[in-house]
Amino acid sequence: MSSKANPPQPVATAPKRSQIPILDSTMSYVEAGASGPTVLFLHGNPTSSHIWRNIIPHVAPFGRCIAPDLIGYGQSGKPDIDYRFFDHVRYLDAFLDALDIRDVLLVAQDWGTALAFHLAARRPQRVLGLAFMEFIRPFERWEDFHQRPQAREMFKALRTPGVGEKLVLEDNVFVEKVLPASVLRAMSDDEMDVYRAPFPTPQSRKPVLRLPREMPIEGQPADVAAISAHDHRALRLSTYPKLLFAGDPGALIGPQAAREFAAGLKNCSFINLGPGAHYLQEDHADAIGRAIASWLPEVVLANQTDELA
């Protein structure tokens, strides 16, 4: 490690949960760390900031870690909205403004990556770096969407009017079946109860149903597909440091395809975590946390160099 990197010094505070008014609702978030760059952790569906619980302790000594519960998820409010991707953009933007978060290192998975890509495309000067895994992108064909045919059939059902409502709103299948099936280790009852808690009723599960229907597959929905394509063009042109994690066989992307994807980006490192499916944070928290903590000095140095250029 170069002495010129001036890496952040280990200073951390214990994680603290806070609630803040955002637009017509509230958003809950976990914060840890006291100095260094701001590291923003963005989760996906149907999880919450809880999924970062074993990763943040590795990173907090080196940066200010903030992990929000997206609107409608975790302990955040559940306003009467459609919970489209663009709703999440609106609430996340307001959240960042409310906390006066400017320059960030983004860490994201699942729909958190779509939000991270969109933020980076619109405000590249605010992005210090991006670590991501199991990411959203435009899928030209259903065959491109998932590593497992059974999962493709499940998502087709979730996108079918009436069928999706039965599966998610009534049976809570995304939390009870999809989530644990996408983690290799056995989830404990206590762990599952945390993920169940935000969704006790059919009405509370609206956000969980909406996002599978927002997935840009075969050009639909058209507005999300167009934005995702735009954001990925911006991602390919960007020069900020990137770190892509993959598991084997993965879910949205396998390790070989992920390696090739990373090679097509500028300034992107790749880490194969080994056996893993979709929720890699639940199977490889320590490895992910250590890798991000080790990568932070590189991000700091890259941004210092840019400032001097």
UniProtKB/Swiss-Prot annotation:
Coiled-coil intervals: none
Catalytic residue list: D110 (nucleophile), E134 (proton donor), H278 (proton acceptor)
E.C. code: 3.8.1.5
Pfam families in the cross-refs: Abhydrolase_1 (PF00561)
GO cellular component annotations of the record: membrane
Domain AB hydrolase-1: 37-148
Enzyme class of the recorded protein, top EC level: hydrolase
Primary role: Catalyzes hydrolytic cleavage of carbon-halogen bonds in halogenated aliphatic compounds, leading to the formation of the corresponding primary alcohols, halide ions and protons.
Subunit relationships: Monomer.
PANTHER family, per database record: HYDROLASE, PUTATIVE (AFU_ORTHOLOGUE AFUA_2G14860)-RELATED (PTHR43798:SF33), MONOACYLGLYCEROL LIPASE (PTHR43798)
The protein's name in its UniProt record: Haloalkane dehalogenase
Organism, as annotated: Mesorhizobium japonicum (strain LMG 29417 / CECT 9101 / MAFF 303099) (Mesorhizobium loti (strain MAFF 303099))
Lineage: Bacteria, Pseudomonadati, Pseudomonadota, Alphaproteobacteria, Hyphomicrobiales
Gene that this polypeptide is encoded by: dhaA
